[in-house]
Regions:
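Conserved Walker B catalytic segment
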Residues: 1-17, 26-28
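Short glycine-/polar-rich loops that comprise or flank the Walker A/P-loop
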Residues: 7-9, 34-37
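Conserved nucleotide-binding/hydrolysis micro-motifs of P-loop NTPases
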Residues: 16-20, 44-46, 90, 193
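Conserved AAA+ ATPase "SRH/arginine-finger" region at the nucleotide-binding site
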Residues: 37-48
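Amphipathic alpha-helical "lid/sensor" segments that cap RecA-like P-loop NTPase cores
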Residues: 54-117, 127
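C-terminal leucine-rich, beta-strand-based interaction scaffolds used for sensing/assembly
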Residues: 116-200
């Protein structure tokens, strides 16, 4: 390839679609197979993020309470895009003193603004897919989507129908698959959609 003969040049390939990135670099059928070192970036630590947010608000003569920051980081799961979106919305509101109540209100407004888009998703999914999507959102992380406990708790169908719904949601990138120390789990891809579904 053109990359191999280049000296003193480093390439960084990044993307949020883990399945696609894994396929590009770990599949022997792909031209980039085994050509890179894979690095997974964990979320920014809550301590570092809290300090950063507080400093940015203070630089602009605004004060945000530690409780408000804590709620933002928990609600956005420290995902950079969603954290920035909430903070930018709060900042644009012009308030000089931001507490947890104003943060909760702002989060609700963000979800309300996107409700029409979220409702459109329902038309793109079958009943089983929508019910499974809601169940995954309400759980946050689902390690055993075929377990009797999960199916019963959310009044879902048979394990076979859940397998089909799960595959469809993964293909449509409505949910994603991830691995942590507890094993493989599924979560809703769009965090704002996930939080909106929790309210339903």
């Amino acid at each position: 390839t053109m990359i191999q003969p280049l000296n003193n040049v480093h390439f960084l390939f990044s993307g949020s679609n883990r399945h696609m990135m894994t396929e590009i670099f770990n599949s022997s059928k792909r031209p980039f197979f085994a050509s890179t070192r894979i690095i997974s970036l964990p979320p920014i630590s809550a301590e570092s993020y809290s300090r950063f947010i507080a400093e940015k608000f203070l630089e602009n003569k605004r004060k945000i309470s530690p409780e408000a920051i804590g709620f933002i980081l928990e609600w956005t799961r420290r995902h950079t895009y969603y954290t920035q979106s909430v903070c930018n919305t709060l900042f644009s509101s012009g308030g000089k003193e931001i507490d947890i109540h104003s943060v909760k209100e702002t989060c609700g407004e963000i979800l309300d603004e996107q409700e029409k888009t979220f409702l459109q998703y329902r038309n793109l999914l079958t009943g089983n897919q929508w019910q499974l999507l809601m169940a995954v959102a309400k759980e946050g992380k689902v390690y055993k989507p075929h377990s009797g406990e999960f199916l019963s708790k959310h009044s879902l169908g048979t394990p076979a129908s859940i397998t089909r719904a799960l595959d469809a949601l993964l293909t449509k990138e409505m949910i994603y698959e991830e691995i942590d120390s507890s094993g493989k789990y599924y979560s809703v891809y769009d965090l704002f959609l996930s939080r909106w579904l929790e309210r339903q």
